[in-house]
Amino acid sequence: MDTEPPENWIIDNSNMPEVGTIEWRGWSFASMDFWVDAEDQLRSQFIRADGTVAVVDPDEWDDCENAASFGSYNSILISPLIQLTGQPINISFDSHYRQEAPQQVSLTVTNSSGEIIEMLLHYSSDSGSDNDSGDVLNQRLSFIVETDEDEIYLKWEMYDAGNNWYWAIDNVTIQSQTPPIGDLNYDGNLNIFDLLTLAEILVGVISPDTVLNHVSDINQDGETSFSDLILFLIYIMNH
């Protein structure tokens, strides 16, 4: 059990009472066994979890001192600063969530100044929310983020909770959204403009970055060569 986040991650508990069960005050990091031993109540159904999970659990927090009577449970888990390269990124994680009003959770994207750019997920007791007011147990969630910002943070937040339920996440991955093979101008199409870009790479006009080098290797033999140009030309002529 650990109430400290991994390196470069931040927990913000500044907007909740300094009471309750200490190990469950705000986002905590626990083994599945430790968490389930507190009380099962469907916690054990998070079978996607592997090792230590990140948990917000106002149900267990409230068991000491009737903590929710002092104010609502509000906690934010903030990712390290994510540098962007102008390409979309994919955020994926395993999630295990039980709903009870007035508890709400969200996943938001903010810029380096903390301003919200996009809300990727919102669960609440409202039938119009992403969970349709119900539980969302043992799911793999995935989101694409496209923004002009150079740097962003991700924020997993629980707020307005009393003696309610919980949210656990695990296996967070943040990856570049690599364009399809051959889409050298990243416009979603394979056409003559991509062929011209490939020719420019081969004659040295363009020095490809890692992503561009991947999508220009048409035959996926580990290098970009004139055989890729011929193969791509044949494809363009037949489509």
Regions found by a protein language model. Give the residues of each.
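Beta-strand acidic-aromatic groove motif in beta-rich domains, primarily in extracellular
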Residues: 101-107
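Extracellular carbohydrate recognition
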Residues: 70-73, 159-176
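Extracellular glycan-recognition surfaces and repeat-rich motifs
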Residues: 1-64
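Short beta-strands within extracellular/lumenal beta-sheet-rich domains
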Residues: 64-84, 138-141
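Extracellular carbohydrate recognition and processing domains
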Residues: 116-148
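Extracellular beta-strand-rich recognition modules
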Residues: 1, 77-79, 84, 88-99, ...
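Cellulosome-associated attachment modules in secreted, modular CAZymes
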Residues: 177-239
